[in-house]
């Protein structure tokens, strides 16, 4: 699946993983280093036949995996978490090369381990609670029991912004539910797969039901053609293609797509709190987060003071160039994204927006970097207020009344997340309840990850479909639900069921 300097990486114990290694004779795909812009890695995509063979092997192993008690799957997943912990240095190094950032890459294995162990703690009780047994409320002589049957094979297509974490966020609960999983990460950031696969191989029971295939869109299509359920995280245009491909096969699909998340800052908000929350919510990870804040609505009475303080703080944010171990934010991971953000800035300035600090991306050592960029005098005719940005841009717009603020916040085709910062929690809740989005942070921004295992949320509008990847639904969505019914009385005699006489 992966072809860096050495031509082969297969394990003889992993036939379903190794099939694509024969592809060394075919063309490889170049992978660019986001810090230098140079190609320093290559991947060899599997053929459609390779993916089909991989899927067949996973399916064969999934039957025993699903039949085992959930406690067995929990134990296996805990072993995997232990192996990731042991190999975290190599994984972090690979993801740092993928993304051009050090701190987040260093924390990535820890976040995945936290997720695996956390879901391992929760899964047995979630599944037990979902197993219902009782008597019909319509016909009391009918008893019933429910049964949960996992989808045999999950296909995951994950994005480039958080390569390792977003490749496992759906697969972890699915594996605990009893599915097998095949994951296709983005071809933009594939380096982490090699050290992560080493950890999977060290847990033999897991290696039978989990693997990665690395390739482009053709690999993704082959994956969809061979699985029973799909989880996709990425852009709306690609998500639409994935949904159409799944619809043709009548298989369920879960889409977590883009956002244009708003924050409302009220007249009563504390400016220190508000500017700290907005700055982190907009520029963390260079703004390359699906639930990053991308629209800021500030009451007109505090607008100028808010902007002044925000600009002051934004100018203290440093790039991690030339030393990746210093600074606050890294380069654009994907060069095409930098061009999209630059085009939005050009459009905004043409339409009258003012850049208070920052500006367009700049080439530093071959990497594309952008300083936190604060815009004022923006309006909803501008692309920067309508289209997903995915960069460290902070457009600030005035509002007069709370009703106007809510109307502006909801003037979007998206509905992923949002935030409200106010003088009190009650005031923030009042406004947050009116925002049409799945996860609303109050008195801060981007809090969604904190409740990953605790509360459910769905994505509104074009930000997604298929249900919640959070809370109990994160596991239960991977089950098909059966009902087994027993009649405790004698079956009705068909000979006694006659047509009614005419009225």
Regions found by a protein language model. Give the residues of each.
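Short, well-ordered beta-strand elements within core beta-sheets of diverse protein domains
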Residues: 39-46, 61-67, 155-156, 263-265, ...
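N-terminal Rossmann-like NAD(P)+-binding subdomain of aldehyde/semialdehyde dehydrogenases
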Residues: 2-142, 316
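Short acidic active-site motifs
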Residues: 50, 218-222, 404
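ALDH superfamily catalytic-core signature
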Residues: 40, 229, 237-379, 403, ...
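Conserved C-terminal structural/oligomerization subdomain of aldehyde/semialdehyde dehydrogenase
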Residues: 36-42, 350, 362, 369-503
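Structural signal for hydrophobic packing residues in well-ordered secondary-structure cores
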Residues: 62, 66, 81-88, 92, ...
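Residue-level signal for inorganic ion chemistry
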Residues: 37, 73, 95, 178, ...
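Rossmann-like NAD(P) dinucleotide-binding subdomain of oxidoreductase/dehydrogenase enzymes
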Residues: 132-273, 399
């Amino acid at each position: 699946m992966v072809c860096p300097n050495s031509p082969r990486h297969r394990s003889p114990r992993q036939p379903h993983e190794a099939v694509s290694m024969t592809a060394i004779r075919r063309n490889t795909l170049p992978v660019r280093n986001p810090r230098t812009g140079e190609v320093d890695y290559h991947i060899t995509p599997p053929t459609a036949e390779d993916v089909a063979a991989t899927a067949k092997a996973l399916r064969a192993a999934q039957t025993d995996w699903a039949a085992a008690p959930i406690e067995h799957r929990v134990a296996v997943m805990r072993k995997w978490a232990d192996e990731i912990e042991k190999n975290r240095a190599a994984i972090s190094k690979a993801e740092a090369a993928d993304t051009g950032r050090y701190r987040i890459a260093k924390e990535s294995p820890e976040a995945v381990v936290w997720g695996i162990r956390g879901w391992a703690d929760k899964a047995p009780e979630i599944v037990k609670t979902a197993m219902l047994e009782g008597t019909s409320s319509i016909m009391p002589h009918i008893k019933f029991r429910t049964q949960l049957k996992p989808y045999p094979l999950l296909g995951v297509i994950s994005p480039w912004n958080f390569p390792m974490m977003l490749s496992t966020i759906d697969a972890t609960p699915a594996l605990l539910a009893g599915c097998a999983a095949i994951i296709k990460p983005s071809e933009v950031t594939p380096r982490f797969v090699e050290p992560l696969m080493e950890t999977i191989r060290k847990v033999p029971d897991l290696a039978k039901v989990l693997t990665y295939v690395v390739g482009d869109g053709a690999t993704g299509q082959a994956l969809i053609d061979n699985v029973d359920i799909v989880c996709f995280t990425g852009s709306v245009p690609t998500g639409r293609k994935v949904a159409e491909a799944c619809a043709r096969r009548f298989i369920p699909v879960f889409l977590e797509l883009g956002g244009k998340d708003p924050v409302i800052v009220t007249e009563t908000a504390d400016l220190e709190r508000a500017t700290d929350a907005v700055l982190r919510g907009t520029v963390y990870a260079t703004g390359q987060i699906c639930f990053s804040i991308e629209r800021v609505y500030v009451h007109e009475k505090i607008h100028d003071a808010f902007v002044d303080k925000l600009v002051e703080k934004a100018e203290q944010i440093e790039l991690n160039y030339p030393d990746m171990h210093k600074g606050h934010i890294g380069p654009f991971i994907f060069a095409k994204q930098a061009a999209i953000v630059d085009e939005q800035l050009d459009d905004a300035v043409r339409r009258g927006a003012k850049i208070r600090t920052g500006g367009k991306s700049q080439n530093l050592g071959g990497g594309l970097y952008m300083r936190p960029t604060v815009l004022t005098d923006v309006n909803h005719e501008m692309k920067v207020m309508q289209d997903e940005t995915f960069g460290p841009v902070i457009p600030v717009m005035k509002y007069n009344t709370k009703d106007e603020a809510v109307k502006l916040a909801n003037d979007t085709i998206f509905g992923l997340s949002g935030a409200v910062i106010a003088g009190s929690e009650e005031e923030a809740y009042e406004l947050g309840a009116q925002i049409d989005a799945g996860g609303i942070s109050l008195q801060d921004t981007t809090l969604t990850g904190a409740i990953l295992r605790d509360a459910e949320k769905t994505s509104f509008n074009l930000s997604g479909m298929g249900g919640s990847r959070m809370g109990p639904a994160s596991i239960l969505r991977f089950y098909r639900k059966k009902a087994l019914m027993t009649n405790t009385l004698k079956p009705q005699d068909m000979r006694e069921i006659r047509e009614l006489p005419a009225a």
